[in-house]
């Protein structure tokens, strides 16, 4: 579509040109024509001229009639609202001009008055419309000039838009290159692969001649060339270095933007080598570590930077523009992120390898510890069995000897031996338990016992110990001591022996004194050592103080320093083998206290023990002895057929004697297989089976199950088991195996008789 001003100029000139022939034709026709003879003959005759004018007027009229149609189409298709009125005026003017020419065709021949009138009216209307159009053009010309100015403005805007579109296209192309480079860079998490991929892809995108990466040295004093795209011709290209205080290095590290290096830059010359090259650009890349990503309190850390150097070819066709530098900056940021991820992965891998090595070391140490623990437990178990079995045999024999007729002095000595053996057996169980589970845990068995008898037995044992050591012994017992109290008899006896053994071990000659009396809370309130923890006893209670004092003669000094107290961590142990810490815990469990007092002259030392006991009133039932080793009547099982199963020869012989003492008919076997074979014979009529649970080849649980299974159709015999421990686990297994009774070792005559009596009564 042609511009608007040129269109109106054409219309204006066509109006001027067409109006002149119409006026001339009208004047010519008004003269009435000329004579045929005046014009001469030929082509320029009057008739030919008139015919030519008539045809011309017709063509002009047709052209004038077609122009308004074009103007009307143009006005409807274009948004020319302010110019539509002038378009209509031009259309009317052109139509009237065409009408004038059309009427003029009829004036070349003789015509009527109506033709002249019509021509006159047409000319008059044409004159009015042309005059109005001329006036309208006077107001339209400034608008046309403004349109021209706007056209120039639009042309300028179009050129600016073209430039912006080109810039957007270049930015889109740069973004595509950046995305492609980022995609290639992030394909790998290896640091060297990332740097090599960066150099290759940047070289393809920016048409580089060379690309190099400079890394800081371990000392941080210089930059070392570590990666380059093309190997230089110099022999020491792999050992090139630049000082860290180089101006270009400092300037590059000071800003995050890319920098174009000067032609004489040492960094640029070292990066391009001996080859001639074009402009050189460089940018920093942060080298982050895994420690930079750890949480917690922020720490001031100096960031380490690498330098990426890019060298263009020498031909001069390429340069470092803003777009190229922007691509380099974005790629450098992406490389920094990828390198940080690679650093995190490398450090994580190193940590993982260290943890794996530590885990292997821990597993090896755990395996060695487990093997050592198993070896220690095996050794302790073997040692415990070697010590426990003879002790159990001795206790069994002593319990049988207690039933013999003896005088009071012999009875006292025998009871002391029984009590001492029982304490030793309990101590072995405690040592085995605490060493196996690696904890200092001991249990108390509170029951009623005779305090007077305990003191007598303790005095008897202490007299024997001091006599063997060559030390004098004296004692004093308060007559106000209650006869029967509730507590752990074995633990109290053991602590007293521990105190005596500790003092005797430190003395070579002197006198040992034992004082037992009741504790008066009102009189001793000022003494902090007497501050006892109040026990939760439902009834009345009594506090008893055991005071053991050693006085050495002046010619002999104590073997240990007088300032050394039992509470110290390096205190010696007693002959019974129990440490003072364990002894103190036992005393605290019994709501008591233990402490020592040394003589200022170093000639004596006193150990005091304060305990609380619950009182038990003496009744006809409770007045009898309830001790484990008592002289009460033993039941008799005359004719009871018993089979004894025990792999230990000594214990089997002692248990055999105990059963015979109870009146049983006993058959002893050494293994569970022999026991099962004994039941296979038709003559077997055993009513009771006494078996040890800890046999070597076949334990007691399997033997009990086999007996129950073998005698399923017949009446099965009663089974009583012998075990070193009677905890809930052992009792549950005995119940599952069909065992009727359980006796804890050491087996004594009284305990064996009571359990057999209970089993026979219940079954």
Curated annotation (Swiss-Prot):
Sequence ranges assigned to domain Histidine kinase in this UniProt record: 382-615
Stretches assigned to the GAF domain: 190-339
Cofactor remark from the record: Binds 1 copper ion per dimer.
Localization terms from the record: Endoplasmic reticulum membrane
GO cellular component, one term: endoplasmic reticulum membrane
Main location, first listed in the record: endoplasmic reticulum
Transmembrane spans: 58-78, 86-106, 115-135
UniProt entry keywords in alphabetical sequence: ATP-binding, Copper, Disulfide bond, Endoplasmic reticulum, Ethylene signaling pathway, Kinase, Membrane, Metal-binding, Nucleotide-binding, Phosphoprotein, Receptor, Transferase, Transmembrane, Transmembrane helix, Two-component regulatory system
Membrane topology designation: Multi-pass membrane protein
Molecular function GO terms recorded: ATP binding; ethylene binding; ethylene receptor activity; metal ion binding; protein histidine kinase activity
Tissue expression pattern: Expressed in anthers and hulls.
Residue ranges of every copy of the Response regulatory domain listed in the record: 641-760
Inducing or repressing factors: By ethylene and auxin. Induced by submergence, ethylene and gibberellin.
Entry-linked Gene3D superfamilies: 1.10.287.130, 3.30.450.40, 3.40.50.2300, Histidine kinase-like ATPase, C-terminal domain
Functional note: Ethylene receptor related to bacterial two-component regulators. Acts as a negative regulator of ethylene signaling. May delay the transition from the vegetative stage to the floral stage by up-regulating GI (GIGANTEA) and RCN1 and cause starch accumulation in stems by down-regulating the alpha-amylase AMY3D.
Alphabetized PANTHER family for the sequence: ETHYLENE RECEPTOR 2, TWO-COMPONENT SENSOR HISTIDINE KINASE
Protein name: Ethylene receptor 2
